[in-house]
Protein backbone atom coordinates (compact mmCIF):
# COMPACT_ATOMS: atom_id res chain seq x y z
CA UNK A 1 0.00 0.00 0.00
CA UNK A 2 1.44 3.40 -1.00
CA UNK A 3 1.97 6.25 1.46
CA UNK A 4 -0.88 8.27 -0.07
CA UNK A 5 -3.28 5.31 0.00
CA UNK A 6 -2.49 4.77 3.69
CA UNK A 7 -3.40 8.39 4.39
CA UNK A 8 -6.60 8.14 2.35
CA UNK A 9 -7.56 4.90 4.12
CA UNK A 10 -7.12 6.63 7.47
CA UNK A 11 -9.79 9.10 6.38
CA UNK A 12 -12.45 6.42 5.63
CA UNK A 13 -15.75 6.69 7.54
CA UNK A 14 -15.91 5.05 10.96
CA UNK A 15 -18.33 4.79 13.86
CA UNK A 16 -16.91 7.88 15.57
CA UNK A 17 -19.01 11.02 15.92
CA UNK A 18 -18.79 13.17 12.78
CA UNK A 19 -16.37 16.07 12.79
CA UNK A 20 -17.57 19.64 12.70
CA UNK A 21 -18.21 20.56 9.04
CA UNK A 22 -15.31 22.40 7.42
CA UNK A 23 -15.71 25.75 5.70
CA UNK A 24 -15.93 25.55 1.89
CA UNK A 25 -12.48 25.31 0.35
CA UNK A 26 -11.60 26.15 -3.25
CA UNK A 27 -8.40 24.94 -4.88
CA UNK A 28 -7.23 28.45 -5.77
CA UNK A 29 -8.24 32.05 -5.23
CA UNK A 30 -10.53 32.72 -2.27
CA UNK A 31 -10.99 29.62 -0.13
CA UNK A 32 -14.63 30.53 0.44
CA UNK A 33 -15.87 31.63 -2.99
CA UNK A 34 -13.00 30.94 -5.39
CA UNK A 35 -12.83 34.50 -6.70
CA UNK A 36 -9.43 36.16 -7.38
CA UNK A 37 -7.53 37.81 -4.54
CA UNK A 38 -6.91 41.56 -4.48
CA UNK A 39 -3.58 42.67 -2.98
CA UNK A 40 -2.99 46.07 -1.32
CA UNK A 41 0.27 48.00 -0.94
CA UNK A 42 -0.49 48.67 2.74
CA UNK A 43 -2.06 46.43 5.37
CA UNK A 44 -5.69 46.87 6.42
CA UNK A 45 -7.56 45.56 9.45
CA UNK A 46 -9.69 42.59 8.44
CA UNK A 47 -11.75 39.92 10.22
CA UNK A 48 -11.03 36.32 9.19
CA UNK A 49 -14.17 34.86 7.60
CA UNK A 50 -13.48 31.49 9.25
CA UNK A 51 -12.20 32.07 12.80
CA UNK A 52 -13.60 35.57 13.34
CA UNK A 53 -10.31 37.02 14.63
CA UNK A 54 -9.03 40.41 13.49
CA UNK A 55 -5.70 40.71 11.66
CA UNK A 56 -3.66 43.23 9.72
CA UNK A 57 -4.02 41.88 6.17
CA UNK A 58 -2.57 42.67 2.75
CA UNK A 59 -5.27 41.02 0.66
CA UNK A 60 -8.85 39.84 0.41
CA UNK A 61 -10.93 38.43 -2.42
CA UNK A 62 -13.04 40.50 -4.81
CA UNK A 63 -16.04 39.92 -2.55
CA UNK A 64 -14.12 41.01 0.55
CA UNK A 65 -13.49 37.58 2.12
CA UNK A 66 -10.28 37.38 4.16
CA UNK A 67 -8.83 34.12 5.52
CA UNK A 68 -5.94 34.27 8.01
CA UNK A 69 -2.78 32.17 7.61
CA UNK A 70 -3.70 29.78 10.43
CA UNK A 71 -7.08 28.98 8.87
CA UNK A 72 -5.55 28.78 5.38
CA UNK A 73 -3.15 26.01 6.36
CA UNK A 74 -5.41 24.46 9.03
CA UNK A 75 -5.44 20.68 8.88
CA UNK A 76 -2.79 20.36 6.16
CA UNK A 77 -0.11 19.06 8.53
CA UNK A 78 -2.57 16.49 9.93
CA UNK A 79 -2.49 14.91 6.48
CA UNK A 80 1.15 15.27 5.49
CA UNK A 81 2.86 14.52 8.83
CA UNK A 82 1.76 10.84 8.91
CA UNK A 83 2.84 10.48 5.29
CA UNK A 84 6.30 11.92 5.91
CA UNK A 85 6.94 10.05 9.16
CA UNK A 86 6.19 6.71 7.48
CA UNK A 87 7.71 7.42 4.06
CA UNK A 88 10.80 5.72 2.65
CA UNK A 89 10.87 7.95 -0.46
CA UNK A 90 14.38 9.25 -1.16
CA UNK A 91 13.52 11.75 -3.89
CA UNK A 92 12.44 15.04 -2.26
CA UNK A 93 10.70 16.23 -5.43
CA UNK A 94 8.59 13.07 -5.61
CA UNK A 95 7.82 13.46 -1.91
CA UNK A 96 6.84 17.10 -2.44
CA UNK A 97 4.44 16.07 -5.23
CA UNK A 98 2.85 13.49 -2.93
CA UNK A 99 2.38 16.02 -0.14
CA UNK A 100 0.96 18.86 -2.26
CA UNK A 101 -1.58 16.42 -3.73
CA UNK A 102 -3.08 15.75 -0.30
CA UNK A 103 -6.35 17.29 0.96
CA UNK A 104 -6.16 20.76 2.55
CA UNK A 105 -3.04 21.72 0.57
CA UNK A 106 -4.18 24.55 -1.69
CA UNK A 107 -2.73 25.79 -4.97
CA UNK A 108 -0.97 28.62 -3.15
CA UNK A 109 -0.58 29.45 0.51
CA UNK A 110 1.63 29.48 3.61
CA UNK A 111 1.31 25.71 4.07
CA UNK A 112 4.04 25.45 1.39
CA UNK A 113 6.44 27.30 3.71
CA UNK A 114 6.05 24.33 6.08
CA UNK A 115 6.07 21.58 3.46
CA UNK A 116 9.47 22.46 1.96
CA UNK A 117 11.62 21.99 5.11
CA UNK A 118 9.62 18.94 6.26
CA UNK A 119 10.03 17.21 2.89
CA UNK A 120 13.76 17.98 2.82
CA UNK A 121 14.32 16.66 6.35
CA UNK A 122 12.48 13.45 5.49
CA UNK A 123 14.42 12.89 2.26
CA UNK A 124 17.71 13.67 4.03
CA UNK A 125 16.92 11.01 6.64
CA UNK A 126 15.80 8.51 3.99
CA UNK A 127 19.09 8.94 2.11
CA UNK A 128 21.16 8.05 5.16
CA UNK A 129 21.66 11.44 6.76
CA UNK A 130 21.56 11.65 10.54
CA UNK A 131 19.19 14.17 12.03
CA UNK A 132 19.70 15.99 15.34
CA UNK A 133 19.04 13.58 18.18
CA UNK A 134 19.73 10.43 16.14
CA UNK A 135 22.07 7.83 17.64
CA UNK A 136 24.59 9.84 19.66
CA UNK A 137 22.19 12.72 20.22
CA UNK A 138 24.60 15.08 18.44
CA UNK A 139 24.28 16.87 15.12
CA UNK A 140 25.82 14.54 12.55
CA UNK A 141 25.80 17.27 9.91
CA UNK A 142 28.64 19.77 9.98
CA UNK A 143 29.24 22.86 7.85
CA UNK A 144 32.86 21.79 7.28
CA UNK A 145 32.86 17.99 7.55
CA UNK A 146 30.47 15.73 5.57
CA UNK A 147 28.18 13.42 7.52
CA UNK A 148 29.57 10.11 8.67
CA UNK A 149 28.65 6.85 6.95
CA UNK A 150 24.89 6.33 6.56
CA UNK A 151 23.23 5.13 9.72
CA UNK A 152 21.62 1.75 10.20
CA UNK A 153 18.13 1.13 8.76
CA UNK A 154 15.56 3.22 10.60
CA UNK A 155 12.52 2.01 12.47
CA UNK A 156 8.98 2.88 11.28
CA UNK A 157 8.78 5.52 14.01
CA UNK A 158 11.86 7.71 14.07
CA UNK A 159 11.89 10.12 17.04
CA UNK A 160 14.69 12.19 15.48
CA UNK A 161 12.66 12.74 12.30
CA UNK A 162 9.49 13.48 14.24
CA UNK A 163 11.26 16.03 16.46
CA UNK A 164 13.02 17.69 13.52
CA UNK A 165 9.84 17.93 11.45
CA UNK A 166 7.87 19.36 14.37
CA UNK A 167 10.57 21.98 14.95
CA UNK A 168 10.51 22.82 11.23
CA UNK A 169 6.73 23.26 11.46
CA UNK A 170 7.06 25.52 14.50
CA UNK A 171 9.57 27.77 12.76
CA UNK A 172 7.96 27.82 9.31
CA UNK A 173 4.53 28.72 10.68
CA UNK A 174 6.08 32.04 11.72
CA UNK A 175 6.62 32.92 8.03
CA UNK A 176 3.46 34.75 6.86
CA UNK A 177 1.78 34.28 3.53
CA UNK A 178 2.75 36.79 0.86
CA UNK A 179 6.33 37.34 2.02
CA UNK A 180 7.52 36.70 -1.54
CA UNK A 181 5.82 39.87 -2.74
CA UNK A 182 5.95 42.03 0.39
CA UNK A 183 9.32 41.11 1.92
CA UNK A 184 11.25 39.97 -1.14
CA UNK A 185 11.78 36.60 0.56
CA UNK A 186 9.80 33.62 -0.72
CA UNK A 187 8.57 31.42 2.13
CA UNK A 188 9.81 28.32 0.28
CA UNK A 189 13.35 29.74 0.34
CA UNK A 190 12.97 30.51 4.04
CA UNK A 191 11.80 26.91 4.47
CA UNK A 192 14.99 25.66 2.83
CA UNK A 193 16.97 27.81 5.26
CA UNK A 194 15.02 26.33 8.17
CA UNK A 195 15.90 22.84 6.91
CA UNK A 196 19.62 23.58 6.78
CA UNK A 197 19.56 25.44 10.09
CA UNK A 198 18.04 22.42 11.83
CA UNK A 199 20.59 20.06 10.29
CA UNK A 200 23.53 22.20 11.40
CA UNK A 201 22.17 23.30 14.76
CA UNK A 202 22.58 26.91 13.70
CA UNK A 203 21.62 29.83 15.92
CA UNK A 204 22.32 33.58 15.92
CA UNK A 205 25.73 33.18 17.62
CA UNK A 206 26.97 29.95 15.97
CA UNK A 207 30.13 31.07 14.17
CA UNK A 208 30.54 28.16 11.73
CA UNK A 209 26.94 27.20 10.99
CA UNK A 210 25.43 30.69 10.90
CA UNK A 211 26.32 31.63 7.29
CA UNK A 212 25.41 28.27 5.69
CA UNK A 213 21.58 28.44 5.82
CA UNK A 214 21.76 32.06 4.68
CA UNK A 215 23.84 31.07 1.67
CA UNK A 216 21.27 28.39 0.83
CA UNK A 217 18.41 30.91 1.07
CA UNK A 218 20.37 33.33 -1.14
CA UNK A 219 20.92 30.61 -3.76
CA UNK A 220 17.22 29.69 -3.69
CA UNK A 221 16.14 33.32 -4.07
CA UNK A 222 18.57 33.81 -6.94
CA UNK A 223 17.00 30.91 -8.83
CA UNK A 224 13.45 32.05 -8.03
CA UNK A 225 14.25 35.55 -9.32
CA UNK A 226 15.81 34.16 -12.51
CA UNK A 227 12.62 32.28 -13.39
CA UNK A 228 10.50 35.35 -12.63
CA UNK A 229 6.98 36.04 -11.38
CA UNK A 230 4.21 36.14 -10.51
CA UNK A 231 4.32 33.72 -7.60
CA UNK A 232 3.56 30.03 -7.81
CA UNK A 233 3.98 28.07 -4.59
CA UNK A 234 4.41 24.80 -6.49
CA UNK A 235 7.13 26.21 -8.76
CA UNK A 236 9.11 27.95 -6.03
CA UNK A 237 8.80 24.93 -3.74
CA UNK A 238 10.31 22.67 -6.41
CA UNK A 239 13.07 25.15 -7.19
CA UNK A 240 14.06 25.49 -3.54
CA UNK A 241 13.99 21.74 -2.94
CA UNK A 242 16.25 21.22 -5.97
CA UNK A 243 18.77 23.83 -4.84
CA UNK A 244 18.70 22.52 -1.26
CA UNK A 245 19.32 18.94 -2.42
CA UNK A 246 22.24 20.06 -4.58
CA UNK A 247 23.82 22.04 -1.74
CA UNK A 248 23.24 19.16 0.70
CA UNK A 249 25.30 16.88 -1.56
CA UNK A 250 27.99 19.54 -1.97
CA UNK A 251 28.26 20.63 1.66
CA UNK A 252 27.22 17.56 3.67
CA UNK A 253 27.98 14.62 1.39
CA UNK A 254 24.42 13.26 1.30
CA UNK A 255 23.09 12.73 -2.23
CA UNK A 256 19.36 12.92 -2.93
CA UNK A 257 17.90 11.72 -6.25
CA UNK A 258 15.92 14.37 -8.13
CA UNK A 259 13.22 13.49 -10.64
CA UNK A 260 12.22 15.47 -13.71
CA UNK A 261 8.87 16.97 -12.71
CA UNK A 262 6.08 17.92 -15.07
CA UNK A 263 3.46 20.06 -13.35
CA UNK A 264 -0.10 18.78 -12.90
CA UNK A 265 -1.45 21.98 -11.38
CA UNK A 266 -1.39 24.44 -14.28
CA UNK A 267 -5.18 24.48 -14.68
CA UNK A 268 -5.56 25.48 -11.03
CA UNK A 269 -3.13 28.39 -11.32
CA UNK A 270 -4.63 31.56 -12.79
CA UNK A 271 -1.16 33.12 -13.05
CA UNK A 272 0.66 30.11 -14.55
CA UNK A 273 3.73 31.12 -16.57
CA UNK A 274 2.94 28.45 -19.15
CA UNK A 275 5.93 27.58 -21.37
CA UNK A 276 8.13 29.97 -19.36
CA UNK A 277 7.86 27.71 -16.30
CA UNK A 278 10.59 25.02 -16.03
CA UNK A 279 7.91 22.51 -14.97
CA UNK A 280 5.42 23.21 -17.78
CA UNK A 281 4.44 19.76 -19.14
CA UNK A 282 4.60 20.72 -22.83
CA UNK A 283 8.12 22.19 -22.84
Give the ranges of each region predicted by the language model.
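A structural-propensity feature for long, helix-poor, extended segments
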Residues: 205-249
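Residues immediately within or flanking Cys/His clusters that coordinate Zn2+
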Residues: 27, 45, 58, 65, ...
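A short glycine/serine-rich beta->alpha loop
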Residues: 58, 99-110, 173-184, 224-231
Amino acid sequence: MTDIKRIEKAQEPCCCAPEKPQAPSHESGCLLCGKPLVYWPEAKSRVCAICGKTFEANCACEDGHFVCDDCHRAGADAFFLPLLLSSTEKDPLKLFEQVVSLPRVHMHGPEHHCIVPCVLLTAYRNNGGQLPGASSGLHAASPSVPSAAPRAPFSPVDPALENSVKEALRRSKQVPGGTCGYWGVCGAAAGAGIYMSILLGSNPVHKDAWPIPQQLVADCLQKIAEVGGPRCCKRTGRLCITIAAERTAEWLGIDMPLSEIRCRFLRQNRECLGPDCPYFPLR
